Amino acid sequence: MYDDSYVPGFEDSEAGSADSYTSRPSLDSDVSLEEDRESARREVESQAQQQLERAKHKPVAFAVRTNVSYCGVLDEECPVQGSGVNFEAKDFLHIKEKYSNDWWIGRLVKEGGDIAFIPSPQRLESIRLKQEQKARRSGNPSSLGDIGNRRSPPPSLAKQKQKQAEHVPPYDVVPSMRPVVLVGPSLKGYEVTDMMQKALFDFLKHRFDGRISITRVTADLSLAKRSVLNNPGKRTIIERSSARSSIAEVQSEIERIFELAKSLQLVVLDADTINHPAQLAKTSLAPIIVFVKVSSPKVLQRLIRSRGKSQMKHLTVQMMAYDKLVQCPPESFDVILDENQLEDACEHLAEYLEVYWRATHHPAPGPGLLGPPSAIPGLQNQQLLGERVEEHSPLERDSLMPSDEASESSRQAWTGSSQRSSRHLEEDYADAYQDLYQPHRQHTSGLPSANGHDPQDRLLAQDSEHDHNDRNWQRNRPWPKDSY
């Protein structure tokens, strides 16, 4: 009878008490696990912050140019919150080291740019795939190649655009210091162009003494297109059709330029075959293109005539090359030297390069470390972008422009009066050339080049298409301090 009695609520209350008793350890365990996770996260972030600080003292392993935009502030998976880099397409990054498969450590090449975490190509590819999946789920037609849009482009055009998008990597490996290349006022190999560029070379050598390497390049760098160097079939075709520069020679020159740039010194190329910015647009050099511009065609004609009959015979081709350069959009060049006075042109170029120097050299925390490092170890983590860069011997001294009395005389030639007309400028250039610099490209007597074609043939065959509107430029002064 007692066993059959029922007390309402007894079993429920006892069961509830048991539940509450057994749930307390579970709740405490969840809190403890959460605290452990937070503690581990803080420890990982602290270690990442320490590695970030240590990277400030490490040399630049390699550099890349970006093909996409990225905002590190919005990336919650950054190892240290708020320490991700922000960059736009066509920016330049110095990579210090690899942190993980998803992250590198480096800095944006910009004055005042600090060390930060940089997403690796794998990380950016993962982000891109997530965005595509999200777009498909939301049914956004613009993200799906305009599927279902009546005004969608023809299949061939759409397929071409898709193919281009698929083959654009997030980063292109470039030299750690962008090489400086002079073009204009006309064709290299003729006296007027050679003497004007020689005066600038001499100025740069003395102005940036100890911080600059000026080297001559005879190989045809226009053959160093990424699509050619990475495609054995194209390499064979070009090697058969070009007697002047084999692809192997061009590849060797490219590697030498990369090697020069590793020292983080300014690199200036005296490139025999480069007369137009389009020739280097698709290479991995990412050069700083400097246009030495004569104010008017009449001034250039007068300069050419002053060099004698041997130069007058080639007046037409030189003027055609001048017209080709003048027709380029300003965005094709990083610097346009259109000053009438040589001193002003030199200072213009020097100020631009000083800004670039500060942008590429992160200020050291210790005092007295203003100069460039005397020796930089070899490239680190080369496998990160799948690039194989071989170590080379120390820089060849004979490849650099020698410091001689001629250079000193050239420097003195433009340190005179600051008030000069075009006529006086012409006389300065003529004297500098006559006394200091004999033409080295074998065109002053009208002789063809080694492959039987004059350089202007290659220049005039260039496309009128200029796909390098990504360069920094301002109409009056193309060296803004905030451009890096």
From Swiss-Prot:
GO terms for cellular component: cytoplasm; L-type voltage-gated calcium channel complex; plasma membrane; voltage-gated calcium channel complex. One of its GO terms (molecular function) is high voltage-gated calcium channel activity. Residues 1-52, 129-170, 390-484 are annotated as: Disordered. InterPro entries: CAB1-4_N_A-dom, CACNB3_SH3, GK/Ca_channel_bsu, P-loop_NTPase, SH3-like_dom_sf, SH3_domain, VDCC_L_b3su, VDCC_L_bsu. Residues 390-399, 463-484 have a biased composition (Basic and acidic residues). The modification Phosphoserine is found at residues 152, 393. Keywords: Calcium, Calcium channel, Calcium transport, Cytoplasm, Ion channel, Ion transport, Phosphoprotein, SH3 domain, Transport, Voltage-gated channel. GO terms for biological process: calcium ion transmembrane transport; calcium ion transmembrane transport via high voltage-gated calcium channel; calcium ion transport into cytosol; positive regulation of high voltage-gated calcium channel activity; protein localization to plasma membrane; regulation of membrane repolarization during action potential; T cell receptor signaling pathway. It is found in: Cytoplasm. The keyword Membrane does not apply. Residues 195-345 are annotated as: Mediates interaction with the alpha subunit. Coiled coil: none annotated. Residues 59-128 form the SH3 domain. The keyword Cytoplasm applies. Detected in the inner plexiform layer in the retina (at protein level). Pfam families: Guanylate_kin, VGCC_beta4Aa_N. Residues 409-420 have a biased composition (Polar residues). Regulatory subunit of the voltage-gated calcium channel that gives rise to L-type calcium currents. Increases CACNA1B peak calcium current and shifts the voltage dependencies of channel activation and inactivation. Increases CACNA1C peak calcium current and shifts the voltage dependencies of channel activation and inactivation. Component of a calcium channel complex consisting of a pore-forming alpha subunit (CACNA1C) and the ancillary subunits CACNB3 and CACNA2D1. The channel complex contains alpha, beta, gamma and delta subunits in a 1:1:1:1 ratio. Interacts with CACNA2D4. Interacts with FASLG. Interacts with CBARP; prevents the interaction of CACNB3 with the alpha subunit CACNA1C thereby negatively regulating the activity of the corresponding calcium channel. Belongs to the calcium channel beta subunit family. This is Voltage-dependent L-type calcium channel subunit beta-3.
